[in-house]
């Protein structure tokens, strides 16, 4: 199956959601090229950037599951 490159940008407004995001990313680790998390303490949010190489439907499914979490926003850009 053909794969696509994508960058997923995640804004987490609640620390309670971080564990769920990490679990979802761990479950899909085979598709992750790299990730970076930045805690922004002044605003009490976390910024996460994830680079993926996966089938487009898999990337969309991961993005959808993360986006359905409470206090989480996600945007995905495809190369």
Residue ranges, per PLM feature:
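Long, contiguous binding/interaction regions
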Residues: 1-79
């Amino acid at each position: 199956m053909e794969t696509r490159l994508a960058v997923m940008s995640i804004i987490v407004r609640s620390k309670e959601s971080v564990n769920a995001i990490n679990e979802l990313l761990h479950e899909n680790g085979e598709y992750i090229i790299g990730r970076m998390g930045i805690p922004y303490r002044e605003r009490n949010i976390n910024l996460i950037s994830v680079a993926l190489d996966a089938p487009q439907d898999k990337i969309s499914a991961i993005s959808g599951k993360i986006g359905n979490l409470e206090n989480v926003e996600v945007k995905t850009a495809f190369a």
